[in-house]
Design a protein with these regions (language model features):
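Long, acidic/serine-threonine-rich intrinsically disordered regions with weak helical/coil propensity
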Residues: 38, 47-161, 165-168, 330-352, ...
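Solenoid-like repeat scaffolds
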Residues: 111-121, 135, 150-159, 185-195, ...
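Generic helix N-cap/helix-start motif at coil->alpha-helix transitions
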Residues: 160-167, 192-202, 226-235, 262-268, ...
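Residue-level signature for tetratricopeptide repeat
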Residues: 173, 202-207, 239-240, 440, ...
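Structural motif corresponding to the intra-repeat A-B loop/turn of tetratricopeptide repeats
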Residues: 177, 210-211, 243, 444, ...
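Extended amphipathic alpha-helical segments with heptad-repeat/coiled-coil character used for oligomerization
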Residues: 215-309, 475-495
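Extended alpha-helical solenoid scaffold regions that build the rod-like backbones
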Residues: 298, 302-509
Length: 656
């Protein structure tokens, strides 16, 4: 990083002259010769408090420990030949090599979008829009849709493009999401992946992020003899340093410098690793996986700006790096968990590892109120663990959720406190806590537990005015979550709901959101309910998607009402139905008929456009007009359940 600086001991001088025009070849030759006596072999000792993130080794390696085989590609083998119906129109074609872009690991039964999900969509549109997928959105529902979109086996969209380019992009996006397991599953399912440098580099980066230096170095050792890119040169130099071959690593660094390579952070860290001296990094605003791996090996303290990165995979690695301060690890961990790349148990462990003074532990609620931040949330979590009285537990959870809602971390904080929340017994003394508990359990999908608290609130509402008002405010959210039988509530009662909440803070904004969500899910909102909102401002400023994306989403959703086109051809095995790539599609398509939405035209396109319309801010920050278009589009393609999940996220993030 040109803008980054590292203070380290003076570099050893090797007295090299300026490189000539063939210096690149010299560098590679020197590195290959240096590798001859022995390949990089060091494996860093496991960190003291690191999340277990080991990945299965590449198939070509032979580690001592046996591991379970990677999932096979979902490209079904042809079944026994069966006669076609008399008169059936088929086209004879030669069975072609399988296109790697069609490979996937998620079956329809597991949530895959089906082999025809790109039917009707051009390759140019996919190549243009898929790289813009909002991989760092803090929405569990969006992340689930992205994962299904990227892991589903499907016929590649039609158009001219390099074979293998789409599968590589899908794996890159999974890795960018921090879903290293999903990326590895897809990698191992690709035939002849060893010939694709782009895929091998993704594999190496994933292993550096997972602190799996041993296998990353195996990849680098094999690649350095064939490829001269600076990435593999630097990776191999790091591996030499890990193996204790510091003179060879220093020679490689000097040669790269002679060539004019610019990466002083990397060079200084490698030199510090060789000299066994601590490196003091002043700045590293956009770290690469290799930077983090070298810094960890060199025990270099990560600078404060390292969390400027907004990449889930990078944040996850920072959160589990022992060479980062507690404050940095907590901030990175909260953001990584919210983006779905870090297990919630790891965040809980980091919360419990934070240290606090006796004064802070004695007054946790006031401390958290005064200084909202990662350490304050850690303090509240620590406090909740030592409380044994249900009322005290409820007070801590309620305060934590209230502060998290203000800070945009509501869903993540609910996941952290969920085990404790489920242990708090509903009682008459805790009626005040029931609305908060119900909302938190709704967004967690814990509907049975939510129902117990809801029934407590409903029973209390018969004699307690506060409980009655709380119930009235909660009923629309309960209906939105799927509780259709609750007090026979319908949208006709929205006018009464408005009277209950209209004096509260941002009532008009919340009503607009709620009405839009119901309308998008196909539940009629009375005209009179909308009319009451006309008393507010007549103009508002909102962030809207580009008009072209807005139009295309409506077009794709409406086009999905027609069944997907399928071309039936006969291969050289004349009685097997295959597509143009020679893949048996009848079995997957037959199974897909039972899944809602599967087999529709532009299914994948509609999902992709919906995710782009919501953007990185997710449903919690989307304007009601945008939400309405996205949810109705998903409903049109048969994804009503997914639309409702997004609606719940939006409603609770919006204060409903």
């Amino acid at each position: 990083m040109n803008a980054s600086r590292v203070s380290s001991p003076p570099r050893p001088c090797f007295g090299l002259t300026r490189a000539t025009g063939f210096m690149t070849a010299v560098v590679v030759a020197c590195l290959v010769m240096a590798a001859a006596p022995g390949k990089a072999r060091a494996q860093e000792a496991p960190p003291e408090a690191s999340e277990p993130t080991s990945l299965p080794p590449p198939l070509q390696l032979r580690p001592h420990q046996q591991i379970a085989p990677a999932p096979a590609p979902l490209l079904p083998a042809p079944a026994e030949a069966t006669p076609l119906a008399s008169g059936a129109k088929v086209r004879t074609d030669v069975l072609q090599t399988i296109n790697p872009d069609t490979v996937g690991t998620l079956t329809v039964e597991e949530g895959g979008l089906g082999i025809a999900m790109w039917s009707g969509t051009s390759r140019n549109l996919v190549d243009t829009l898929l790289p813009r997928l909002p991989v760092n959105a803090a929405s569990a529902a969006m992340r689930s849709l992205m994962r299904r979109l990227l892991l589903s086996p499907a016929e590649a969209p039609r158009g001219e493009s390099e074979s293998g380019g789409l599968i590589a992009l899908r794996i890159e996006l999974l890795a960018a999401m921090g879903d290293l397991a999903g990326a590895h599953q897809l990698l191992t399912a690709i035939p002849k992946r060893d010939h694709n440098e782009r895929l091998i580099r993704i594999d190496a980066d994933s292993r550096f992020l997972a602190n799996d230096n041993h296998r990353a170095c195996n990849l680098a050792t094999r690649q350095i003899a064939e490829r001269a890119s600076s990435y593999w040169q630097k990776a191999f130099i790091f591996c030499q340093a890990l193996a204790g071959e510091h003179q060879k690593a220093a020679l490689g660094v000097s040669l790269l410098r002679e060539m004019g390579a610019k990466d002083e952070v990397f060079f200084s860290l490698v030199e510090a690793l060789a000299l066994g001296a601590a490196a003091d990094m002043e700045s590293l605003p956009d770290p690469s996986p290799l930077h983090l791996a070298v810094a960890r090996a060199a025990k270099a303290r990560l600078p404060a700006d390292v969390v400027s990165s907004n990449r889930p995979g990078i944040l996850k690695t920072i959160a589990t790096s022992p060479n980062a301060s507690v404050e940095l690890r907590l901030e990175a961990a909260e953001r990584a968990e919210a983006m779905g790349s870090l297990a919630v148990d790891t965040l809980r462990q980091l919360y419990t590892s934070a240290s606090f003074s006796d004064e802070e532990l004695a007054n946790p609620l006031s401390k958290a109120e005064a200084e909202s931040g990662p350490l304050s949330r850690a303090l509240l979590y620590r406090t909740s663990l030592v409380q044994t009285v249900p009322t005290a537990q409820a007070e801590v959870v309620a305060r934590a959720l209230s502060l998290a809602r203000e800070g945009g971390l509501y869903a993540s904080t609910v996941r952290v406190f969920l085990p404790l929340l489920k242990r708090i017994p509903p009682s008459d003394e805790l009626v005040w806590f029931a609305p908060e508990a119900v909302r938190a359990l709704f967004i967690s999908g814990e509907h049975q537990a939510a129902r117990i608290w809801f029934d407590l609130l409903r029973a209390s509402s018969k004699y307690d005015k506060d409980a009655k008002d709380a119930l009235a405010a909660l009923l629309p959210v309960a209906h939105l979550a799927g509780y259709k039988d609750v007090d026979k509530w319908t949208t006709d009662r929205l006018i009464g709901w408005w009277r209950t909440i209209k004096e509260s803070k941002e009532a008009g904004k919340r009503a607009t959101l709620l009405y839009s969500l119901f309308d998008a899910l196909g539940e009629k909102v009375p005209d009179e309910a909308w009319e009451t909102l006309l008393e507010g401002p007549q103009r508002i400023t909102v962030a809207m998607p580009h008009p072209a994306l807005w139009y295309r989403l409506a077009f794709a959703a409406n086009s999905s009402k027609a069944p997907a086109e399928r071309e039936v051809v006969a291969s050289v095995q004349p009685n097997i139905l295959v597509n143009a790539e020679g893949v048996d599609v009848e079995a997957p398509l037959a199974a897909a008929q039972a899944a809602p939405g599967i087999g529709r035209r532009r299914l994948g396109e509609t999902v992709l456009l919906s995710l782009l319309a919501l953007g990185e801010s997710g449903p919690g920050a989307a304007d009601p007009v945008v939400l309405s278009r996205v949810l109705s589009s998903l409903g049109t393609i048969g994804m009503a359940a997914e639309a409702r999940t997004l609606a719940i996220e939006a409603a609770l993030a919006g204060g409903l």
